[in-house]
Amino acid sequence: MLYNENNAPRRIIDSSLEILDLFTSPQQPFDMVVGILNGFHGKFINKLSDKYYYILNGTARVEINNEVFQVHSGDFVRVPANSKHSIDGRLKMLIICSPPYTPSSEEHCSE
């Protein structure tokens, strides 16, 4: 099968993040989306899924459990389940969630 971001369904998550649903299937152990970030997104805890970010282009500041990383094109970031995380910058990234992302598994953190 061939998947292309130009044909992917688009979702606006908030004022800073747009998601292109590249590959999602309840029968698979993961899902894969393209994220287009333009600002601050977070802080969240995903109770179910590990998240993996592959930075396609741009730069951002990623915070995972109070540890800060500056990321650039070509960087790969793992956010384990139950980790408080946020991302702030301008970039395009491939996001993989395993098991697949469900909105009910993610909680917004006030701090």
Which positions does each model-derived feature cover?
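Conserved short histidine dyad/triad with adjacent acidic residue
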Residues: 31-48
